[in-house]
Amino acid sequence: MPQFKRLLTALTVTVATAAGTATWAQAADTELNLYSYRQPFLIQPLLDAFTKETGIKVNTVFAKKGMLEKIKAAGDNSPADAVLTVDIGRLYALKEAGVLQAVKSDVLEKNIPAHFRDPEGLWFGLTTRARMALVSKERVKPGELTSYEDLADPKFKGRICVRSGKNAYNVALIASMIAHHGEEGAEKWLQGVKANLARKPQGNDRAQAKAVYEGVCDIAITNNYYMGKMMTNDDKPEQKKWAAAVRVTYLNQNDRGNHMNVSGAAVTKSAKNKEAAVKLLEFLSGDAAQKIYAEDNQEYPVKPGVPYSKLVQSWGDFKGDTLSLEKIAKLRPAASRLVDKVGFDEGPGS
C-alpha cells in the first residue's frame, strides 16, 4: 500500500518547547481533530470515505507514542475530539485517566457486541484480532496443538517462540488466562510456557514466524493480521516465505474460543466537536468502513455479518472468546506482575 502524507490544512500547530504542548487552531463545526495511534496508510481510506459521506473534515495527528500524556497535559484545552488506538490496555488507560467522555449511541450499541465495548460507553472496539499460533507445516501435525493450555505441555519443550511477555498483546493474553484459570493457575501455565521456549523472548510478531521458517522453533504466537501482511508483502518477499512455512492454528476451538483483542476509538472529555466525533465512530462501525478494515489490514470486523477478507476466510472459520475486554483490562496489572514473577523474559532455563 502506498504511504500517505497527511496535510494538516485548516489546522495550526504551534510547538511550545518549554511546556511541551501544542496549540491548535479552533476547528469549524464541519471539522474534527483526531489523535491516531493507527498507521496513516490504514486510516486514510476510512477518513476519506467518512468525509465524502458526511462533509466533515478530519484533521489527524499520528501519535504512536505519548497520546495519553499529550491529552492529559493539555487538559480541557486539548484539541483532540476523538482518539483511535489499538489494544484494550491503551483504551482502558485512557478511561482510567479520566480523559474520555461517555457516548450514548443506538448505532454503536447495535453494531458493536457488548463484550467489545465499554459498559459505560467510554470506548468502542472497531476491529478484533486473534492472538493465535502459527505452527510449522513440517514439524507440527494438525491437531497436535489445540489450546493455550497445550503451550505449557512438556511435549513442546524447546519449540515455542514469542515476543516479550510485557508486550501489550501478551499481557492481554495472560490476563485472559487469569480470568479463566485464576492467578495461581495462570502462573503455573506461564511457568510451563517459559520452560517450553526455544529462546529468550525477543523481536516482534513477524520475527517469531521467521524463527519457525529458520527452524529455531516450531510454534509462534502472533496476532492474525501479521500473517496476512506477510502473505501479501511484495516489498519484502522473504516474508512470504516465512508465511508459507507455517499453518494458521486457532486455539481453544472446542471450548471458550481463541483469545481476542481490539483496536478501538473514543471521544475525549475535552471534545469541542463531540457530535462530529460520534458520527465518526458510528461511521467506522458501519458496513463500509468495516469492509475497508477487513480488506486493508486483514483484521476481523467487529460488526457481526460483515465478511472477512478472502485471505482470512481461507484460514477457515473459528470461534472467538467472548470474555469481556473490560475484565481483561482490569487484570492486566496482575498479568504484568506474573511476567516478572516467573522471569518470563529471561527465557528458558533461567
Predicted feature descriptions by range:
Residues 27-92:
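Early extracytoplasmic/lumenal segment of secretory-pathway proteins
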Residues 35-38, 119, 135-137, 143, ...:
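Short beta-strand->loop
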Residues 78-83, 101-135, 149, 159-162:
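A structural signal for short loop-to-beta-strand junctions that line the ligand-binding cleft
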Residues 101, 138-146, 178-187, 271-277:
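Short helix-loop capping/hinge motifs at secondary-structure junctions, enriched
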Residues 132-139, 260-273, 292:
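A bilobed periplasmic-binding-protein/Venus flytrap-type ligand-binding module shared by bacterial periplasmic
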Residues 158-165, 283-307:
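Periplasmic-binding protein-like
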Residues 176, 181-251:
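Ligand-binding pocket segment of bilobal, Venus flytrap-like solute-binding proteins
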Residues 321-350:
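Conserved C-terminal helix/tail region of periplasmic/extracytoplasmic solute-binding proteins
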